[in-house]
């Protein structure tokens, strides 16, 4: 199973508009971060996790092939703002979208023309599905993982020995048990140490990682305050890394 990190940035992306810090002015391409998203491929099957406002740019860099399903972690714009750009992929067939009830309602409210009885030509053909327990989508067996983004319940996902969690500030013990011992974990870390009300930091993520004990960890959903990619890589434990846009790995 191949995983591609399409975007590794937080809601503002990196560089942040108007900022002249060393990260935002870095010439290292790993310090350039589009909004967070991941593409999972196994054989001919392709699964997208989140579809933010940078989706079009992200997919112009990839081979144009069918997307079998989309998993949404939650309703915020940086994770759903690119759904309309699924239009070209709908030429290859309708695209099922899986999300929790709150996100399903949000998508219907912001893209009403996709779900009206009378549709004009060219709109994306999206099929919304409310997640209720484990399910299959796009040829993958998927286990939803409930986490909290501040007070907002959102979803992470386990797919085989891989788990993807973003925007998390807290996870309940029974949900943590579902991903203990996995091979590869992608998890959010907004910045290195300064606490935030609805996103965990690298230091806070260490506690979760020590419970899960994955073989390898990639941090995602990072802001410019994370620090320079090259510098932070040197101080992380050997099995932990900052993800970067375009990173590919296999599970």
Walk through the language-model features, giving the residues of each.
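Active-site metal-binding motif and surrounding structural segment of the metallo-beta-lactamase
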Residues: 44-99, 182-184
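Short, glycine/charged-enriched secondary-structure capping and boundary segments
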Residues: 18-20, 62-64, 84-88, 111-113, ...
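Binuclear metal-ion centers of metallo-dependent hydrolases, dominated by the metallo-beta-lactamase
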Residues: 172-251
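Short glycine-/acidic-enriched loop or helix-start segments at secondary-structure transitions
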Residues: 15, 58-60, 81-83, 108-109, ...
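Core dinuclear metal-dependent hydrolase active-site scaffold
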Residues: 1-49, 53-62, 125-177, 245-251
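Active-site neighborhood of phospho(di)ester-bond hydrolases with catalytic His/Asp-centered motifs
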Residues: 48-52, 68-76, 98-100, 163-168, ...
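Active-site neighborhood of divalent metal-dependent phosphoester bond hydrolases
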Residues: 91-93, 103-128
